[in-house]
């Protein structure tokens, strides 16, 4: 199984699969086959709304700034969580 979180010189990279237009915004868990963190996002995938909601949600959960590295128009995204370690991300997201 590939972990959805990897160390990066500026923090931690998180591979995410987004399910937009969900009832609520919440973590669904890890898709072990794809090696991604599954996240439901209530916002629709229109004009970057789902991306903004994803980054704000992860930023609150991780208590840091998150930014989109790739996947702006895809369900699979790479997010950089700045200035937090892999262990901190795993702990704060309940991935242990």
From Swiss-Prot:
Pfam families under this entry? DUF167
**What name appears for this protein in its UniProt entry?**
UPF0235 protein MK0273
Listed PANTHER family: UPF0235 PROTEIN C15ORF40
- Would you identify the family this protein belongs to, as annotated? Belongs to the UPF0235 family.
Q: Which Gene3D superfamilies match?
A: YggU-like
GO CC, alphabetical = cytoplasm
Name the source organism. Answer: Methanopyrus kandleri (strain AV19 / DSM 6324 / JCM 9639 / NBRC 100938)
């Amino acid at each position: 199984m590939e972990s959805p979180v990897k160390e990066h010189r500026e923090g931690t990279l998180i591979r995410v699969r987004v399910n937009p237009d969900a009832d609520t915004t919440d973590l669904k868990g890890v898709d072990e086959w794809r090696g991604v963190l599954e996240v439901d996002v209530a916002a629709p995938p229109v004009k970057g709304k789902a991306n903004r909601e994803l980054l704000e949600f992860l930023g609150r959960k991780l208590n840091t700034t998150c930014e989109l590295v790739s996947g702006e128009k895809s369900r699979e995204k790479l997010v950089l969580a700045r200035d937090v370690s892999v262990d901190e991300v795993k702990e704060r997201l309940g991935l242990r």
